[in-house]
A protein has these predicted regions:
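Conserved PLP-enzyme active-site core in the AAT-like
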Residues: 1-143
Length: 144
């Protein structure tokens, strides 16, 4: 299971991560998306799966020296930042409500967590231009 935003879903729904992931052989959890760690992820699965994954990682050059400080940042994020994910959801909802006021926004998909997806009715506004203008206002946004 790609758990990049698993904890966002847990906060939003009240369903725990174990329940979400019980039908998967493995779960990957990212510490740098919503949790605020600079880097880091963890892969969980059966002992056999993890042992195989470890060997593949080593073959592909995935070893890191002195990764303890990064692990400490991930632990801090787990201990202190999960409860803050609901704030991200509130900010996303606020952004969606503000976007609804703009004539140039045609459709906003339902906002459930921290992802806001919308279309522009004014096709003369390029996605890269919108991204730049929103970043100037302090928003981190990507276009696809």
């Amino acid at each position: 299971m790609d758990g990049a935003r698993l904890l966002n879903a847990c906060i939003k729904t009240g369903v725990d991560a174990e329940t979400y992931s019980k039908n998967f052989d493995s779960v990957w959890l990212d510490f740098s998306k919503g949790l605020g760690a600079p880097v880091g992820a963890v892969l969980a699965g059966s002992e056999e799966f993890i042992n195989k994954s470890w060997r593949v990682k080593q073959r592909l050059g995935g070893a890191m020296r002195q990764s303890g400080v990064l692990a400490a940042m991930c632990l801090y994020a787990l201990d202190n930042n999960i409860s803050r994910l609901s704030n991200d959801h509130e900010v996303a909802s606020f952004l969606g409500s503000e976007l609804e006021k703009l004539e140039t926004v045609e459709q906003i998909l339902p906002i459930e967590t921290n992802i806001v997806i919308f279309d522009l009715s004014d096709k003369t506004i390029s996605a890269p231009n919108l991204v730049q203008k929103m970043r100037e206002q302090g928003f981190q946004i990507g276009a696809f």
